[in-house]
């Protein structure tokens, strides 16, 4: 029944799917009669975009500019603003701090969550991640139910590290025995980094929309990590990025470039079920409120 509701919810929300506006050249963004005005600073040409059609603005050019009135309007309309560095990797994000009317109460519930509750939540997250990794390998013809032995043995808090053990098998089967998943490693690691960073931004936005604090994690608790809860909740979604990177590699693309950035951004509107991350965040908030025990994550298809 929960799966049926999730499918209906995803279908309904897809009808209202929004887009990411990516600025890659020297343009100025301003507010014009309630619309986003995008002015080419070289030609003076102006393009207008409706605020209602945009859920994220990504600034990927250090010469681009945005006016304060537009920034204020964007965050008031729950549009995230993401800034990229000189390597085109997203490095910072601006979001509305009052995106949910139940925010204060949900913050309190989240902070009051017991250790056993968080351990059970982490078990669910790890199970969902391993399940999607296993499904992806099966769909790619790289092994049926290969990781399910680890899925079936995840304990509270993943005390036996089934996630790490499954990951070793997963990457070897997915990318080949010579591949090493390393943030600073050789291609296609940079594309994985880019996709995961965008995923993290999208999950942070969904958590804020659900009235949760992305800064308070379930498992990730590094004091230098700004969004540990997003890092926790994005785990079951990583295989979506992995599959898109594989598709790009089949097309001969191995590094972050215009083609790979476009494909990885479109992933969040074409491949991942619409509003799936908001559903995951909302059901997590429900667990903290005592209204349920299950966090909903989509199955990769």
PLM regions and their residue ranges:
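N-terminal amphipathic/basic-hydrophobic helices that include classical n-h-c signal peptides
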Residues: 1-15
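Active-site helix-to-loop segments that bind/position phosphate- or nucleotide-bearing substrates
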Residues: 9, 17-20, 26-27, 35, ...
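N- or domain-start disorder-to-order transition segments that initiate the globular core
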Residues: 13-50
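Generic structural signal for well-ordered secondary structure
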Residues: 29, 50, 63-67, 119, ...
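A broad, structure-centric signal for solvent-exposed, well-ordered loop/edge residues
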Residues: 38, 45, 56-58, 66, ...
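A short alpha-helix capping/helix-coil boundary motif
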Residues: 48-51, 181-183
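Glycine/small-residue-rich interface belts in oligomeric ring/scaffold proteins
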Residues: 49-102
């Amino acid at each position: 029944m929960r799966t049926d509701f999730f499918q209906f919810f995803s279908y309904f929300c897809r009808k209202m799917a929004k887009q990411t506006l990516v600025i890659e050249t020297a343009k100025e963004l301003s507010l014009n009669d309630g619309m986003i005005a995008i002015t080419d600073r070289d030609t003076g040409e102006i393009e207008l975009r409706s605020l209602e059609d945009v859920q994220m603005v990504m600034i990927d050019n250090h010469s681009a500019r945005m006016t304060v009135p537009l920034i204020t309007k964007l965050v008031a309309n729950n549009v995230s603003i993401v800034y990229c560095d000189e390597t085109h990797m997203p490095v910072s994000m601006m979001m509305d701090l009052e995106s949910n009317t139940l925010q204060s109460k949900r913050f309190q519930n989240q902070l009051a969550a017991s250790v056993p509750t968080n351990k059970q939540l982490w078990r669910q997250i790890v199970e969902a991640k391993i399940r999607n990794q296993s499904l992806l390998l099966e769909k790619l013809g790289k092994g049926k139910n290969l990781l399910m032995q680890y899925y079936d043995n995840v304990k509270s808090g993943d005390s036996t590290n089934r996630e790490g053990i499954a990951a070793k098998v997963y990457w070897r089967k997915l990318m080949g025995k010579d591949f090493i998943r390393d943030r600073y490693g050789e291609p296609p690691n940079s594309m994985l980094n880019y996709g995961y960073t965008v995923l993290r931004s999208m999950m942070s936005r969904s958590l804020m929309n659900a009235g949760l604090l992305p800064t308070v994690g379930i498992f990730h608790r590094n004091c230098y990590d700004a969004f540990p809860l997003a890092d926790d909740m994005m785990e079951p979604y990583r295989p979506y990025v992995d599959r898109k990177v594989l598709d790009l590699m089949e097309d001969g693309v191995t590094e972050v470039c215009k083609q790979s950035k476009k494909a990885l951004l479109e992933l969040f509107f074409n491949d991942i079920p619409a509003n799936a991350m908001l559903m995951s965040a909302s059901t997590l908030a429900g667990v903290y409120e005592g209204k349920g025990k299950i966090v909903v994550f989509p199955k990769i298809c």
